[in-house]
A protein has these predicted regions:
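Residues at the starts of beta-strands that form the adenosine-phosphate
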Residues: 50, 82-84, 266, 289-295
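Long, C-terminal catalytic modules of enzymes
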Residues: 338-451
Length: 451
């Protein structure tokens, strides 16, 4: 059972975070990816001061093209607008996984710049590590005037539900001038002006090996950087706290760690990839032992963006959803007692051949964590992550919170027993062989740390 001293230590961490006062009327939830796309395009079209788009990638497909064209249109109509886009340096200069690197997103950014002379929409490539596998720009948020449109989504056809398929995420718009300024200033000083950051919309950009030393130093500088602001809200009022971090000792990681044990009744977690760091698993077990309820909503393996249907050619990356399911099955087998008593509720999300990308936490009715953080070892150690922690002590967001969770649960089934999940023996032959080979050389543990 969590001792009072330990719980107070966790609550003390949250109490000491600087909090910005927030009006309930200035928080808007969107519940579907198409609504998010329309809201983003409307915000861009009506912006009067600044547009700062930060995402893992802005893809050269219909969805991505619609966003970049809207940015060029806004800048052309209002030249005084400060417009900038920031994406991951490495991701922008390769094709999709398994595709050739010809005609990359960076090549497209260059063409758009050439086709729109005199209309400057800079696209910056942020290198979080010397290789994409060892760290990416996973910072999220679209800062438009005094609003932050926050989602874990990147910008392409499926995230924006441009056509038939969608990738489900969370979407909030928070109007808060102080928070928008804090985030914008941090992006300006640490990303736009960062060592090793270069424009991708210029053909004269350097090659990655040429800036390797800059990237290494830059990564250390990112580790040491954080938001600096003073809070202006009491602990009994609705407030928001922006968080940013890189590396396992970041303030963001510490806050996630301390947030979980503060649940008095119930903790709800969403993650698309079930691969929780060990210390978060320990938090969950301690909550269960002290009589609290824990709900975990994850994607079914077929709703994973890396899933390859059995009738398509198999690629190694297609083993990932199975590795995540193995993790979940092992976790449930340890905690089957709490599943039987309905204290531990695990839901699998599946909606036809759409995919699931939700992440975040809800602690009782008091705390909500909006984040792009997948709550996995990769997010914990390698990627640049951020979040917005909402404190709602008077439960003013209760209706929106319940609607969001109701819609998330809509396409889920509850796992009643760990044997409801397939075992390795049930997997397709190629997947089974690969996983057994990985286990034999113990590389599956290494993979779990970087994915």
């Amino acid at each position: 059972m969590l001792s009072k001293f330990k719980r107070n230590k966790h609550q003390q961490h949250l109490a000491q975070l600087p909090k910005l006062s927030q009006s309930v009327d200035d928080i808007e939830f969107f519940y579907a990816p198409a609504d998010f796309r329309q809201a983003l395009l409307a915000k861009i079209a009506h912006a009067t001061q600044r547009i700062c788009i930060v995402a893992l990638y802005l893809e050269q497909d219909d969805g991505g093209k619609g966003i970049l064209q809207a940015l060029y249109d806004a800048k052309r109509q209002r030249p005084e607008l400060d417009v900038r886009v920031l994406v991951d340096w490495h991701r922008a200069q390769r094709g999709r996984i398994g595709a050739a690197a010809a005609n990359t997103n960076a090549d497209w950014y260059c063409r758009m710049a050439q086709e729109n002379p005199g209309v400057d929409v800079p696209v910056y490539g942020v290198p979080v590590n010397t290789r994409e596998a060892l760290g990416v720009l996973h910072f999220k948020g679209f800062i438009i005037d005094d609003c932050v449109l926050y989602s874990g989504a990147s910008l392409n056809d499926v995230y924006l539900h441009q056509h038939d398929k969608y990738r489900y995420d969370r979407y909030q718009c928070i109007r808060n001038g102080k928070m928008a300024d804090v985030m914008f200033d941090w992006v300006e000083h640490n990303l736009v002006e960062g060592r090793g950051v270069n424009r991708l919309d210029s053909a004269a950009r350097p090659k990655s090996p040429e800036i390797k030393n800059d990237i290494r130093q830059y990564r250390q500088e990112l580790r040491d950087s954080g938001y600096h602001f003073s809070g202006n809200a009491d602990d009994d009022r609705l407030s928001v706290t922006p968080l940013v971090g890189l590396g396992k000792s970041s303030l963001l990681n510490k806050t996630i760690f301390h947030l979980m044990p503060c649940a008095e009744r119930k903790l709800t977690i969403c993650t698309p990839y079930f691969n929780l760091p060990a210390l978060l698993v320990r938090n969950i077990i301690q909550l269960l032992r002290s009589g609290k309820q824990v709900e975990i909503i994850v994607g079914d393996k077929t709703a994973n963006d890396f899933y390859i249907p059995e009738d398509q050619p198999f690629k190694i990356i297609g083993a990932l959803p199975y590795l995540y399911e193995i993790n979940l099955r092992r976790f449930l087998s340890r905690l089957q007692y709490y599943v039987n008593t309905d204290q531990l509720i695990v839901r699998l999300w599946k909606d036809d051949d759409n995919s699931y990308h939700l992440k975040g936490m809800w602690v009782d009715y008091e705390w909500m964590l909006l984040t792009g953080n997948n709550l996995n070892p990769r997010a914990w150690r390698l990627d640049l992550e951020n979040a917005i922690l909402i404190h709602d002590p008077q439960h003013q967001l209760g209706a929106m919170r319940e609607k969001e969770l109701h819609l998330i649960r809509q396409h889920t089934t509850v796992v009643k027993h760990y044997r409801d999940l397939q075992s390795i023996a049930d997997y397709p032959v190629k997947v089974r062989k690969l996983i057994r080979r990985l286990r034999r050389i113990r590389i599956d543990r290494l993979i779990s740390r970087i994915l």
